[in-house]
């Protein structure tokens, strides 16, 4: 209610109407659902990207074509970091475990996304060896574009993995 009063019942945020939840518990659970859904969809994109790579198919082109269907959730493969998505997923899994419930899909998605940093680092390392590079520049360090926030960034995992292979690694985040 307070939020609705502050922004006004007719107010829109990013061209969407403000939705008034019946309780803070509903609002927080809805936000968690949104973040967990994104985690699961990115895991699907990551797995599908691996499949496409094995088939010699460009995942970005596949995604663009699939997005021509109105109800396709356009999500690209990548690292999942930050202070919301993975954190909310782990919180949900802990709450479910406390209630003796299993969330197999969510757990699998989290496992897939946690493994992605190592896969990215391996691809970079293999390419560095192929071109005989001793120095790597990682462009972008925060967990998403246009933010200085580096909390739980998975680029740090990529950086650390590359350093273990004795490569000189620099980072720049424009």
Question: What do the predicted segments below correspond to?
Answer:
Residues 53, 97, 163:
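Anion (oxyanion) recognition and catalysis
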Residues 45, 49-75, 86:
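Long amphipathic alpha-helical segments
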Residues 23-52, 82-95, 114, 153:
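Active-site-proximal catalytic alpha-helix in oxidoreductases
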Residues 1-8, 12-13:
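Single conserved hydrophobic/aromatic residue that forms the stacking wall/gate
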Residues 137, 144-174:
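NAD(P)-binding Rossmann-fold cofactor-contacting core
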Residues 10, 14-38, 63-83, 101-112:
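Conserved Rossmann-fold dehydrogenase catalytic segment
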Residues 123-136:
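Glycine-rich phosphate/diphosphate-binding loops that line cofactor/substrate pockets in enzymes
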Residues 111-121, 148-149:
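Active-site glycine- and acidic-residue-rich loops that bind
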